[in-house]
Amino acid sequence: MSRNDPIRLVVIGAGLVGQRHARHAFSHQDFDLAWIVDPNEARQEMAQQLECRWAASLEDVPAGDCDAAIIATPNADHLPSGLTCLARNWATLVEKPVAETIASGETLVSAFEVAGLPLLVGHHRRYHPSFDKANEMISSAALGPLISASLIWAVRKPDSYFKAGAWRRDSDGGPLLINFIHEADLMLGLFGPVDEVQAMVSSHARGSTVEDSAAILVRFASGVIATVMLTDAALSPWSFEGASGENPTIAETGISSWRIGCTAGSFEFPGLRVWTDAQGDEGDWSRPLKDETIETARVDPLHEQL
C-alpha cells in the first residue's frame, strides 16, 4: 500500500455504532470499506449497499484483504477481536471501553505496544468543535480560573435496546461503561487528571444486575470539583447527544447538559452559552448578567475522528 492508497478497512460488529462507522468509512475518501463482520446474516444487505463483503466471523476475512480494523462489538469481545487484528498486523480502532475489565485492557494495550502497531480508542467527542472551544476558554482563563462543573446524562433507553443485545443487561453493559465513559473522557480533556472519585449506583428502575443510574463526585488535581448525574432510565432533554445532535439514534433537544463555572463567568456545554457580568466587570451575585452563545460548526465527530 502506497501512502496515497485508501486504507482498506474492516468494521467488526455492525450494531448501533458499527453501522455508523461503516457508513462513514464508505463515504470517506481516505478509506476503502472492504469487509463488515457480524454474525447477523441481515447485515449482508448492508454490506451490499456499501459495496463491500460480509462475513459472519472475523476468521473468514483474509488477513491480506485489510490494512486496518474498527472493533465495535460487545465489550467482552474487544480483547479477542483485538488480538486477532494484531495477529494480522492491522492498525486498530476499538470502540470504548478498550475492554470490559482493567486486566483485559492492559493485556490488549501491552500486546499492541510490544508489536509497535497503533491501537486507538474511539473517544470521538474530542473531535467536536465545541470541545476545542471549551478547552480554549478554560486554558486561556477567558472567564477566570475554573471552579466547578455539573454534568447530567439522562435518557430513557427503549426496551428494544436491551432485547437486541443480552450483553447490555450484564455487568459490562450498563451506562457507566457504555455512556458515562464519554463524559469521563471529556472531563479529563477539559479539567485534567483526577485525584479522587466517590460514587453511588442503583439498579432500582429495571432491577437487573447492571446499574441503571449513578451519582458521581469527582475531585481533580487542580482542585476543581464536578458532579455527575447519570441514568439510562429517565426521559429527559439532558445529554451530550441530545444537545449536539451528533447521534442520529438520540433525538436532538438543543439543551446543554453541562454547566461549567469560573470566577468571572460560566458557560453551558456543548452549546457554549456564556454568562458574564452585564457591564463587563468582575461581577458578583448582586449584579445582572448577560449571555451570548458561541456558534461552532455542525459536524459529526464520529466522521471527524476518521
PLM regions and their residue ranges:
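Hydrophobic residues in well-ordered beta-strands that form the structural core
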Residues: 56, 94-95, 119-121, 150, ...
